[in-house]
């Protein structure tokens, strides 16, 4: 059958008429470990539900509850005086001395993200448990569990509402239970009939800490009694629990006590609001709010390869943990699991990133432990950026809004870091770690390795997310008022941080330089971290300059100094193994399979590494890295392989991401067949290990990148369909993906060929569509949707 392009007035396509399979995580037993619990969240308030039949533990979080207070902007005002000595040591090739001197250019580590509290719902009934079931319905953002005790059915439902700022729980059946609130942070609990109130503060001096108030109210048709710190419900057929919380956090630069928000008044208003509607009315508002975002994207990767027993309606459905286990151990590469993981990533971002100026952190929103791994902070040398990779392409641009204010806070503090640590009076910079207080100084506390501590490219990398938002949305006012000032500020710092290369006059390099968390081995055998002219630094700066210059052109601004500096940047080089060099010299990595691949930023998430020879070298770098790494790095590598148009490799890495990983500290024979290392936990959380949410988001973005890629240059958009789609994805469809230039794309495929496609434009423009080895240019008016038949 000959291929042809038909532009028609069709109102729908076969692809868009098809249904996505129900997206439901399902289990037949309660959670024992955090990595089995089910998350709900409204972007600020979150919960991890274990679903026990005896003591149902529910961990609560508020994304604004952190230790600490605003940073001291004048800290280490003389640290920059060490920079000349470090440069001198480097250019004399005395790397050991440079490493040791770097310790003087370190400041304090970040603050900690902390858990809010723990809710206990204890079933006071006795008797045998049968027919247990626990689900998270991603399509409708609700957790349900049910069981029979002595033949009597008990059901429980849980959701977190963004429009009404609450968590709601409904218990039905033979309800006799005790309800208690406690916390790992300093707190006190008071009870009155039908209500619990818990007040407390983050760990630390109460006069210097963020305070909170959690209020819980109960409506029931049964009897209630109150003790000192708990409530008891008896003889009930239904009980509804509402939980609200507010903190004194009032902004990155406001003292949480002296200038704190009026959290007590706010939480009282939140609780009063719960009296105005029923559980079902609250849920209807929650569902409408959630589905307005979630329903934008539907996906089917292989409609003819679905095992009926994998779907929620199946009588003998395989549980999600078994589905995950069979995927790797049983060789059953279920496309349903791949779709479920994709949509779970979208669910997590919608549920964790809706608080002004407070983006999702390493834990997203969900942290049951008092001291989260890596402080639960913002790690800006990959992890925070990766959190937002799916935001635009997977049609959730609003979820990236918390980054805008957060980056503005980094810029405000970062101009002091630029002056204090680097003697640069223009622009701003940010380092490896940050927290809710927008900390920007290099970390390490003058005693930790420079490989992660001494790095000042965080802001320069992070602001490219703002440019991505403009490319996808074409919101010129956003570019003018938000993105460009922050991008230009980061670029101004970089312009002044670059120095002329004494080894090659006329070139510009950075010194000192590190490649995030990686280490080199010199040709003389020295094992170190500090260098000059590191490829990652220059890749970030190159991407930033290209994007800032492009943004300036859109706004009618000239950046001649930046253009000249861009042309002088030390170029990429290729090493003795055919790989892209990560270091100025052709040195080997100390660990060839290191988890970071920061020198490949220009390939993904950047867009400037387009030269075929350099792409081949990047491919060789990935081959050397291999396929065994952390969860978040696996997510990154899916995208890198997809950018190289290598579907087999991209899919192989996606399969690796779905390796079943046993929970931390798990015991028992059932866990012996589960794996260790990077992959996916039973509840589909990403395993670094431990849990880091960025791997989930990297995986979701990776599926998008395999299905569709787009570029925008000088106002001309190009969209490529199925650039790296897996061969296993025989026949499917996707709707609602977004492309650079302001386009929304739906299409279906069969046997690697696009069958039908539609494109909708947010603004008037011309787009080049690449599909089935063909190229076609289409002109669209603002709001216009074109349906395209490709067979």
Residue ranges and their predicted role:
Residues 469, 476-497, 542, 641-657:
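Extended amphipathic alpha-helical segments enriched in small hydrophobics
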Residues 43, 471-474, 499-502, 553, ...:
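Hydrophobic alpha-helix feature that most strongly marks membrane-spanning transmembrane helices
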Residues 364, 368-369, 508-512, 518, ...:
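C-terminal catalytic domain of Rieske-type non-heme iron oxygenases
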Residues 18-450, 468-470, 480, 488-491, ...:
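Aromatic-residue-lined binding/catalytic grooves and analogous aromatic/hydrophobic interfacial grooves
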Residues 382-392, 456-467, 536-546, 598-607, ...:
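Well-ordered alpha-helical segments within folded domains of soluble proteins
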Residues 106-124, 693-740, 744-745:
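Catalytic cores of secreted or luminal carbohydrate-active enzymes
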Residues 1-20:
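Bacterial Sec-dependent N-terminal signal peptides
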Residues 368, 493-551:
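Acidic/histidine-rich catalytic neighborhood
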